[in-house]
Amino acid sequence: MSVVSMKQLLEAGVHFGHQAKRWNPKMAKYIFTERNGIHVIDLHKSLKKIEEAYEEMRKIAEDGGKVLFVGTKKQAQEAIKEQAERSGMYYVNSRWLGGMLTNFSTIKKRIERMKELEKLDAEGILDTDYTKKEAAEFRKELSKLSKNLSGIRDMEKVPDAIYVVDVKMEELPVKEAHLLGIPVFAMIDTNVDPDLITYPIPANDDAIRSVKLITSVIANAIVEGNQGIENVEPQSEEVNVEEGSAE
């Protein structure tokens, strides 16, 4: 059974690329045609790449590997969090802090600080042992740390793979993963350079439905790898979005 159907890809608008004038020539082999100034992605090639990515991601999970989901743009934030949590993996959906992979020891200290502040707050110590001003400053610090690090709070080491929604926006995590030899799975729209992507998935990275569908397929691969569940259905739902890309 295919991990996703052509019908699902069409309904989610996976085939709508960016304006032709914004294209990256390196994406030419994945483009089917141009329609009304918009590049149309070849879904037959997308389907093949999705299946390749699914199988590799399934193997990583089966071997006990950990995956980091990355998507900080508005259209991706919800799907990234939902699907990472569903598959028991980690995520960054607010802001990528430089060095999250290449300087993970420092990031880990920030996570420890976050947990320390959480403990002080939960036990009421912030209110009993500190002034109101100090407590307010600590809570402000905790809020900022939680926003950026809550999705990786239990990540003990750099992940075995990362999954990225927008390669252009998430240029830094892609480069950090590449430097460390961590495989990169990513949705690649018609305006990106796919060279640093280990397992590229040609797809519309602007439409919410497209992002949710592809991200759910990746999560399904992890779930199957972890639990041996077969025939996992990709999650897609009707969302009122523009057919074309935002730019």
Swiss-Prot record:
Keywords: Ribonucleoprotein, Ribosomal protein. InterPro entries: Ribosomal_uS2 (IPR001865), Ribosomal_uS2_bac/mit/plastid (IPR005706), Ribosomal_uS2_CS (IPR018130), Ribosomal_uS2_flav_dom_sf (IPR023591). Pfam families: Ribosomal_S2 (PF00318). Gene3D superfamilies: Glucose-6-phosphate isomerase like protein, domain 1, Helix hairpin bin. Belongs to the universal ribosomal protein uS2 family. One of its GO terms (cellular component) is cytosolic small ribosomal subunit. One of its GO terms (molecular function) is structural constituent of ribosome. The gene is rpsB. This is Small ribosomal subunit protein uS2. SUPFAM superfamilies: Ribosomal protein S2. It comes from the Bacteria. CDD domains: RPS2. GO terms for biological process: translation. Transmembrane segments: none annotated.
